[in-house]
Amino acid sequence: MLLHISATAFVYNPNIMLIWWHYLILFAVAFGVTLAAVPVVRSVAIRYGVVDQPGARRVNKEPIPRMGGVAMYAGLLAAFAVEYILELAHVWPGPFSLAQGSGVNMLGVMIGITLIVIVGVIDDVQSLRPGVKFLGQIIAAIVIASSGVLMSGFKIPLGDGRVVLGWLSYPVTVIYLVAFANIINLIDGLDGLAAGITGIGACGLFILTVTLVRNDASLVAIVLIAVCI
């Protein structure tokens, strides 16, 4: 399958070439903005003392600035803004519009992501109580699930069957999103580890969604790869 994808990528086809331009442009925007934002966020974090001190969970011997996620969020937001503007200008057919047609509200998804970032920044600055942080994550996850990003079911690994979750899609999705956010937070004991693992996961998602011709999801994946590098 991967060989087939690689081969078709080099055969001229207007639609295929257009989506690869999508990938390159959004990757460049996300990467460039994140790269430019890192020193700014770093300076602000150092100035206000928002740093990780050496401790039992950390291998660093000196303080490391927090809030790296803000720079990544800036890259993500910039790439999505460029995509949205170019879709409105009819520069290219819009995979985000496609997502809207399939019941996914991208604006709602971005609001949910923004809420998660806000909770993370506040926690970095003043260390939120676990209950308050957990509540903020749940609210953000509910917003994302309500925007149409749902785990509708899953395939049984050792058979051809599929379990359809039905109304359970909402609570299962919320639990998954909150759990995922906290898992990433827990492994963030080494500088760059969380971003590296997220980037590797995004690479896998990109390959899968390109295979399934899910251009909306593959664009999100390529932007994630760019901000994690």
Briefly describe each language-model feature range:
Residues H4-A7:
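Pyridoxal 5′-phosphate
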Residues F10-I229:
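"…together with the soluble PPM/PP2C metallo-phosphatase catalytic core" -> "…together
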